[in-house]
Swiss-Prot record:
Family: Belongs to the UPF0161 family.
Function of the protein: Could be involved in insertion of integral membrane proteins into the membrane.
Pfam families found in the cross-reference section: YidD
Main location: membrane
HAMAP family in alphabetical order: UPF0161_YidD
Protein's name according to its UniProt entry: Putative membrane protein insertion efficiency factor
Record organism: Cereibacter sphaeroides (strain ATCC 17023 / DSM 158 / JCM 6121 / CCUG 31486 / LMG 2827 / NBRC 12203 / NCIMB 8253 / ATH 2.4.1.)
């Protein structure tokens, strides 16, 4: 992971350590948004990974999506499926 990606991962790790135990396990997606963010930063670096993580976190609300949504490149079988 690049140094900038490591810096961007710090708030996610802090959330997982400090807030997640109190908030509970109510993520709409699988993998959870925090796991997705760390995986996106690891696979795609700070810029693209940060964009993917931000987009995912912003879509996590009652009117957003839900279900299985892995980071692009993490599940080639899922990546090949047509969207829609």
């Amino acid at each position: 992971m690049s140094p900038l990606a490591q810096v961007l991962a710090l708030p996610v790790r802090a959330y997982r350590l400090l807030l997640s135990p109190w908030v509970g396990h109510g993520c709409r997606y699988q993998p959870t948004c925090s796991v997705y963010a760390l995986d996106a930063l690891e696979r795609h670096g700070a810029l693209k990974g940060g964009w993917l993580a931000a987009r995912r976190i912003l879509s996590c609300h009652p009117w957003g999506g839900s279900g299985y949504d892995p980071v692009p490149g993490a599940d080639p079988e899922h990546d090949r499926r047509p969207r829609g």
